[in-house]
């Protein structure tokens, strides 16, 4: 390292920062250092030695609810993971995906994957959409494992990265209300550890343990109140999972029971499921039923889906950066990312009676 520093005309500390991915050196400096290292045949600091000196493993974990298969198949989760991977690679830090069950009862045993994180196989964890009372969350906080949350849990002293879910939900509902829709169906991700049964009117949907969905539903109520439309009929159904099959089953039941003229989905996956069900039933979109999603995953653009855009990859990058700062002993912080309504071709005026 000393020879590389001399050849590059920088300090040894700068060489160390370059290889650790630290922001203390510019990209131009980093390239000069790497070029000098290549000329000298230097391949970088000894990772094992560095880990021993710092007491670190060099790997972070990402806790995802449900199975790993569901996580990688969900386009929104995949974009979050992409952002986390980008930051981890720059910092030369490994990444481990840790699935956790949706259980929240303290009387039930925790997910068996957790001992891996608690045995010191990771230096810290990113928690994605875990309930605040999940036993895994309690175990992590009790053992003071460096952690950051994406969307939830929201707990005192725990850094998190999120969006204004309530405000975004209000924008989503306001859009369909402004088109004249008064009979609206909501296809939701699971509002708690177990999906609710059947189609329910919005006022009957309570309590909601998932923080971001609780805020979305509050946003829907805000939009209705602001529009002065107490007679609007809104029915909610929960899909068993965030996949097309679960979404299609939920949408089919919603259409049969509530006959909505607009479908508001809490994810693009379920919005696409709605489009598939409507097409199979020869129900024209948006002439007879409008559909709006949430996330603006790549499939939304392909399907011409109106949706709420959230910066998924950027949320992942922010969470990973905050976690690496925590592991290094730097300040805790939180981040709120912006959202945007993206109007495409799946929403339009309500049909005339």
What are these regions, as identified by a protein language model?
Residues 1-58, 351-353:
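N-terminal helix-turn-helix DNA-binding module of bacterial transcription factors
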Residues 5, 127, 264-266:
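Short beta-strand scaffold positions
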Residues 11, 58, 123, 181-183, ...:
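Short acidic/polar active-site loop segments enriched in Thr and Asp
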Residues 31, 35, 43-114, 124, ...:
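Amphipathic helical "hinge" segments at domain boundaries
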Residues 39-40, 86-90, 141-149, 153-353:
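Bacterial carbohydrate/catabolite-sensing allosteric modules
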Residues 93-119, 127-130, 190, 236-257:
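Structural motif
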Residues 110-164:
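Short beta-strand-centered segments that line the small-molecule binding cleft or hinge
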């Amino acid at each position: 390292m000393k020879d590389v520093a001399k050849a590059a005309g920088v300090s040894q500390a700068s060489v160390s920062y370059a290889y650790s991915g630290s922001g203390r050196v510019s990209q131009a400096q980093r390239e000069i250092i790497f070029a000098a290292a290549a000329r000298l045949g230097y391949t970088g600091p000894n990772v094992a030695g560095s880990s021993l000196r710092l007491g670190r493993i060099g790997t972070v974990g990402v806790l995802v609810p449900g199975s790993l298969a569901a996580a990688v198949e969900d386009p929104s989760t995949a974009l979050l993971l992409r952002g986390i991977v980008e930051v981890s690679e720059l910092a030369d830090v490994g990444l481990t995906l840790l699935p956790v069950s949706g259980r929240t009862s303290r009387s039930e045993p925790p997910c068996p994957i957790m001992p891996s994180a608690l045995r010191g196989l990771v230096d810290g964890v990113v928690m994605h959409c875990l309930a605040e009372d999940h036993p895994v969350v309690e175990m992590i906080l009790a053992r003071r494992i460096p952690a950051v949350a994406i969307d939830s849990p929201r707990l005192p002293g725990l850094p998190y990265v999120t969006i204004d879910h309530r405000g975004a939900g209000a924008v989503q509902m306001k859009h369909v209300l402004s088109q004249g829709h008064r009979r609206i169906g909501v296809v939701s991700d699971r509002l708690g550890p177990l999906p609710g049964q059947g189609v329910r009117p919005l006022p009957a949907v309570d309590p909601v343990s998932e923080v971001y969905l609780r805020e979305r539903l509050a946003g829907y109520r805000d939009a209705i109140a602001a529009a002065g439309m107490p007679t609007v009929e809104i029915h909610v159904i929960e899909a068993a999972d965030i996949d097309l099959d679960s979404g299609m089953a939920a949408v089919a039941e919603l259409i049969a029971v509530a006959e909505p003229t607009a479908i508001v989905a809490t994810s693009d996956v379920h919005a696409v499921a709605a489009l598939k069900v409507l097409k199979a039933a020869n129900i024209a979109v948006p002439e007879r039923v409008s559909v709006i999603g949430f996330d603006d995953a790549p499939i939304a653009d392909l399907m011409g889906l109106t949706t709420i855009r959230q910066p998924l990859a950027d949320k992942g990058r922010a969470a990973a950066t905050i976690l690496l700062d925590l592991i290094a002993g730097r300040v805790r912080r939180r981040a709120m990312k912006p959202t945007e309504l993206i109007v495409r071709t799946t929403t339009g005026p309500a049909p005339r009676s």
